[in-house]
Amino acid sequence: MKRILVAATIGAASVVVLAPGIAHAGEAGYLARISVDYGLDIYDEREALALGYAVCDELRAGKPREVVADRMFLKVLDMTRTHADGIAFSAQRELCPETAQ
């Protein structure tokens, strides 16, 4: 599994990564999805969640998920299209499902 540290510049920049901690159901689902389904190693849960919630802020502001993912892909060094799409999808599905159409 490729180790990846993703610095995102969506709103307030954050990093994708996983450390031990307690997460709520939606948060745990988000962390599991980006780790298991999209192969991201998570070193810091708080930063990974901050990135997910930054995605949700963009979605709530009316930006389409594809646009949010494109911005991550284009702005973050070593971000793959699959990772960007996966982070945006996982955040929408698990952290802010009310933004799905």
Regions found by a protein language model. Give the residues of each.
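Alpha-helix C-capping/helix-to-loop hinge sites
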Residues: 37, 41, 55-58, 75-76
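Acidic/histidine-rich, surface-exposed loop or edge segments in extracytoplasmic proteins
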Residues: 33-36, 68
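Compact alpha-helical subdomains of small soluble proteins
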Residues: 63-101
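Short, surface-exposed acidic
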Residues: 39-48, 79-84
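Cleaved targeting-peptide boundary
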Residues: 25-34
